[in-house]
Amino acid sequence: MKKILSLKKVNLLGPILLALLIAIPLYPKFPFQNVENTYVAIRIEDFLVAACLFVWGLYQLKNGFPVLKLKITKIFLLYWAAGLISVLSAIFISDIINPKLALFHFVRRIEYMSLFFVAYDAMKKLKLREVALAISFTSLLIFLYAMGQRYYSFPVVSTMNEEFSKGQLLILDKWTRISSTFAGHYDLAVWSTLVLSITPIFLVILKRKWERVVILLTMAINFYLLIMTASRVSFVAYLIGITLALLLLKKYLWLPLVLVISIAFGFSSAQLSVRLKTAIDPISSKIASIESWQKIVLFTEQSKDKYFKKPTPTPTTEPDISVIPSQVASDDTTPSIQPGKTTPTPKEGKIIYKDGKGSAWPSPEEAKLAAERSSSIRFDVEWPRAVSAFKRNPLVGSGYSFLGLATDNDYLRSLGEVGILGTLTFLLIHLHLLLTSAKNYLSRNNKNSVISAGLIAGLVSFLANAIFIDVFEASKVAFYFWMIMGILYYYLQTGKTHEKKV
């Protein structure tokens, strides 16, 4: 045991963190072990994280668990305690969820968030330059794979439905929004938004010209990836994040130029522009409509028997894809699916064939219908179901796993699953991060102000995405978010960046 504990001298946490920053986004979501009653699976990345936590635990044991001295640790523990209370209540009092499934999702929440502390301790020896270059290297590989996916039929491993989540290799046609190494285009969009929101601070901290060029290329790559995903929510979240970053960094002259270029490129993308234009009216009318809120109330009253006995996940919008024949078992009664032989069907923001020649964008009526469908799924099904779960037990909610895999609003999901108690403690974590950042930003330490700008911009853009996307449950982006927060929080607590004076 003494030999194992002596690993402190080797400082394995730094290399492990860099490995996680690179491996988690890049390794496709192949399932290692399926879990009964859900298509969330145990994957290779879970073993990598488990090994990382084991090494981190040895360091903590050797030093008397210094992590417990951090104020934010107590808030994390409060949230996990609230989640456990919610799960126990749903299992033993309400008896409305599968115990194994609920505990599985509870442990996964802890797994995602635990990397905050691993990243915090790993930065005691790492330089911010090394983190920035790891993110840049990862972005480049994700971009290259995305190009291969779009132009050379590189496969994607999707988790958009139960069949795809079994690890099938799928081929996207050239009109489908790309996913690269992620499980869906929304995940890729959220990840790119997070990276774009924090990378401006690297331009300020790093002083070598070649490093700044690398960071600028990283931003360009991730912006292009964001445009290719055609995610309206993430595009708006990016505009919020980059605006905050530039304002807090006092780059006032850069802000109008960056916003003009971003919006111009956003609307120059036919797919994204159609989705942006057609989203405004349906969403605003849904929000303003009394009928929509009456539907939520009616749904709440009528959903007890339908939703509280055996909850099932609500399917999210699926990409239009072709399955590689070798990956699919077929029989005489099922026609084989050949790549490139599929007949495209009109989908949300999708190009369709006309007369077999060229391609054309959907008509305004088709695009409007697609946008209305997307908002209706949230307003008429997923969100009312979350409200119903919350009303059943407002204090502690209905337990993890109760709402299935899709709510498309992490705040309503939190209220439905862990109630007021869990939601308040969860938001308290983010409030602590924001207040700590604000306090450091207002200090006279220029380094702390720069780091604070990145943390605030990254956090706010991520929280903006959470309004319409379940970002805290998507493993790749959740892992990355908590690692980034841990990295930046370390610098705010210690004032060390291991870089030259800013």
Regions found by a protein language model. Give the residues of each.
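Membrane-interface micro-motifs in multi-pass membrane enzymes
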Residues: 40-44, 105-109, 179-195, 415-419, ...
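Transmembrane alpha-helices of multi-pass inner-membrane enzymes
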Residues: 53, 253-257, 454-465, 471-502
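Helix-loop-helix junctions and helix-breaking kinks within/between transmembrane helices
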Residues: 41-44, 183-189, 214-246, 250, ...
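A conserved mid-to-late transmembrane alpha helix and its immediate loop/hinge
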Residues: 179, 184, 382-384, 393-437, ...
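Alpha-helical transmembrane segments of multi-pass inner-membrane proteins
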Residues: 53, 81-88, 110, 114, ...
